[in-house]
Amino acid sequence: MFEDKKNESYLMPNYNRASINFEKGRGSWLITKKGEAYLDFATGIAVNIFGHSDKLLTDALCSQAKKLWHVSNLYEIPEQELLAKRLCGYANLDKVFFCNSGLEANEAAVKIARRYHYSKKQLNKNIILCVDNAFHGRSLAMLAATDNNEY
């Protein structure tokens, strides 16, 4: 990013970033200011699985942004209820939990499992299995679950 190397980034160095940046994306391609195209194998670590600049998604986001940008979970959100109902129907579940990231999902899974067994007086059910060579998030609990010292 800084060609003269005299400047330093103001970002904490928690990523080993490649010395390249992109101006835009189309589908599965990332494009530099010079017009060089790179196939996006990382897809934003799975957050861009539908590709970049998808017309259907862009139109839906613009339409929603003209109505409401964000509503706190302190209020009822009819669309959220509808999606929850659909997910429960597809997965044969009673409830779902929406969150913003894998970290929040992992933290919630641990808390929900602990609460469930605590409520059943199964205090011996306190072992949490973790996947080797996986990244679970940067909270203290999830870092403890990660076997990679790099994190």
Residue ranges and their predicted role:
Residues 42-43, 144:
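Short clusters of small/polar residues that mark proteolytic maturation junctions
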Residues 31-32:
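Hydrophobic alpha-helical segments, especially N-terminal targeting/anchoring helices
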Residues 86-151:
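PLP-dependent aspartate aminotransferase-fold enzymes
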Residues 1-26, 43, 74:
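Active-site-adjacent loop/helix segments that line or gate small-molecule/cofactor pockets in enzymes
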Residues 38, 44-74, 78, 84-100:
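Glycine-rich phosphate-binding segment of PLP-dependent enzymes
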